[in-house]
Amino acid sequence: MNIILKCPVDSATAPALSRKRPLVLAPFLGQTVLEHALTSLAAEGVKHVCIEASDRVEEIRNVVGRGEAWGIKIEFSRAAGTQADFSPARIITLDRLPQLPQQPLWRSYRDWYAAQQALIPALARQRVGMREAAPGVFVSLRSQVAGDARLLGPCWVGANVFVGPRATVGPGTIIEDGSYIDGGAEVTGSVVGPQTYVGAFTELRDSFAWGNELLHLDTGSLTEVADRFLLGELQRQAGLAGGLRDAVRFLRKKAPVKSAETNSRQIAAPRTRLEPLLGN
C-alpha cells in the first residue's frame, strides 16, 4: 500500500510548536508526531510512504531516514502526487494522528496536549522499557526517580530523566527524554520538552517548557527564561549519568549551602512559579 503523507508547514493557531523544529517533529510522548504516524501506518501494512514537506526537510530526513526503522520505504517530495510511478491508496495530511483520528493536533496548543494525554496508556504499552509504576503513572526503566518524589497519574516520565527529592510530577504531566526535574520542583498539567532542566523549587502549571522557552497552553504566551537556575536547556547525553548530572552539580555550587541547619530548612522553601508574560 502506498501513502502520501503531507506535512503541514506551520500552524496559525499554534505557531510556537514550529519554532525549534518543523511542526511534524514536535515532541510527542518520547518521539515526534511524524514518527508516531509512521509507526501506525507500518502497523496497517503500508510499505511505501512519500512525504510531502517543504519546511526544514533535511531535519525531517535526519529523523526518519529511508524508513528502515519501520520496515517501509520513505521518499521525499515537494509535490508527491506528481510522481508518475507513485499511485497512492490514500493521501493523509498530518493534522491528526492515525492512532487518534478524531483529535486535531494543531488547532490549538491544548489540542496537541490533549492528544498526548489521550494516548499515554497506548503508546506506553508500545514503548520498550516503559512500565506502569502506579495507576496512570508510566516511567521509563532508564530514568531515576527519588524515593520521596511524588508521581501523580496520568503522567509520563521518559528515558534518561531524573526526578529529584520532594519533586511533584503530575497529574496531567509529560516529562520528555533527557530532562532533569530538580528537588522540590512541581510540574502539573504541563509538558517538559527533551533535555530540559527545571530548577529546584520551581513550579510549572499548564505550560510547555522546552529549553529556556516557556509557553502557556491556554493563552499561547511565550517567554524566554533568562535564569538558568529556573529553566534551561541541557546538552544531549548518552545516559543519565555523566555530563547531565555534572552540569546540574555545577549550577548548585554557585549557591553553596551555609550550614546543615540551612539545608534542612530547604524542605519547606517557597516555590518559584514560572508563568509566561502576557501579551507575547
Regions found by a protein language model. Name each.
Residues 1-60, 72:
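N-terminal glycine-rich phosphate-binding loop and ensuing alpha1 helix
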Residues 30, 135, 141-142, 147, ...:
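Short, well-ordered coil/turn residues that connect adjacent beta-strands
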Residues 44, 58-104:
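Conserved beta-loop-beta/alpha segment of the NTase-like Rossmann-fold superfamily
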Residues 63, 118-119, 193:
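Residue-level signal for well-ordered alpha-helical positions
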Residues 96-173:
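Extended, small-residue-rich solenoid/repeat segments and analogous flexible loops
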Residues 180-280:
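Glycine-rich hexapeptide-repeat left-handed beta-helix
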